[in-house]
Amino acid sequence: MRLNTLSPAAGAKSAAKRVGRGIGSGLGKTAGRGHKGQKSRSGGGVRVGFEGGQMPLKIRLPKFGFTSRRALVSAEVRISELAKVNGDVIDLNALKDANLVTRNIQFAKIVLSGTIERPVTVKGLKVTKGARAAIEAAGGKIEE
């Protein structure tokens, strides 16, 4: 076997269908588009969601909900990620310096996921009940 003798398995490749190339091809004349109508024309077609003038489903259904603007500037931090923070005091700036949250984040909450080995002091961050218990069990404390 040599590189110049390699070829795809039989039946693995099929030639592209050439449309509009005579009656004998099976896809001549109308080229599989049928007769007349918007979809048969060059550049013809309708936008996504268009239902031929009938009121579209997207508009027939009621609006609901909204996008919370606070969610755009809030983040959750796992307790296992706190090991990446240098120093014993963890606040929002320390999380940003450790690249655990992005620069535009204004609120952060520490959640229980994983374990924490060293004692740390958490300042000015929200902490869930489970995370609070884990931090205090490791010898750390939470300051509001």
Curated annotation (Swiss-Prot):
InterPro entries: Ribosomal_uL15, Ribosomal_uL15/eL18, Ribosomal_uL15/eL18_sf, Ribosomal_uL15_bac-type, Ribosomal_uL15_CS. One of its GO terms (biological process) is translation. Residues 1-49 are annotated as: Disordered. SUPFAM superfamilies: Ribosomal proteins L15p and L18e. GO terms for molecular function: rRNA binding; structural constituent of ribosome. Coiled coil: none annotated. The keyword Iron does not apply. Binds to the 23S rRNA. NCBIfam families: rplO_bact (TIGR01071). This is Large ribosomal subunit protein uL15. It comes from Shewanella piezotolerans (strain WP3 / JCM 13877).
